Every structure is written in structure tokens, then in C-alpha cells.
Amino acid sequence: MWTIIAESILGNGDKAVQWYKMLTPIEHARTKESANKYKVEPYVISADIYGTQNLAGTGGWTWYTGSSSWYFIAGIQYILGLKIEHNVMSINPCIPKDWDGFSIRYKFCESIYNIKVANISRSNSETVKVVLNGEKIENKIPLDGSGKIYNIEVEI
């Protein structure tokens, strides 16, 4: 998890997502053969994946790890770049260069935030423009729970 976060902080979206996919449990159980080798639940983050001799590729310690929460943080806060601190949202993605972008629908109390990120520069990171309901703003969006709908466009 720490490598994913570090690669994101360094602006290496291609590597961050490569590591993210490597740790995704389902990637180790896509076929019957790989599932038989993995031997643990394909829906739970494994604390260990053995790498020696006849145990290579076998997962372990699936329900004893806090890794799933860090996996969530790595994906949402560092790759997709959605961070909320003190009821203020910022969006600083670090995604692969070949991604066109992505969208997020975030609900805060009764308000809806429709977020669309466009990777127009084909870079891994560096948010260049944030538009809230048609108006260019700084990348600090105060959250309110008034029931309004907010449309946010982010360009990297």
C-alpha cells in the first residue's frame, strides 16, 4: 500500500495503478487455475502472498489485516485524488496517462457532488483547472449539506 501512495505522491500514476492492480485480490483468481493457486478469498485483501517454492502465489492472513482500509485510501485519496479535510474537498488525481478520465458521484449529507475528471494533457497528475457549476475556482471546494447538486469538472 505504501508503494502505491508513494508513487502517487511522486506523480507516477502508471506505476501507482500497476501496483494497485497487483494487490487486487481478484487479479489473483481470474481463472480456476490461478484461484486454486491463490487458495484464499478473492474478495479480501491478503496480508501475504507467498513467493517461495511450492507456495508461490498463495495468499495468507486474509481477515487479520488492516490493509483493506489502506487499499481504499490509496485508491480514493491518492490515485483518484479525492480528499476531504475539515469539510473541504480537493481533487488531485494521479492516474495512468492512457486514462481518458473518470467520474465520481459523492454525497455529503443531502448534497450531491458530480465530479468529472478529464485527462486532457495525458499526464499522470497536476490538476490544472477546477470548475464548479461553470465557474473556475481554486481546488478547495467547501462541502455543504443543503441538498444542492454541484457539478465539478477537473482537468489534468
Model-based region annotation:
Residues 2-156:
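Non-catalytic C-terminal accessory modules of carbohydrate-active enzymes
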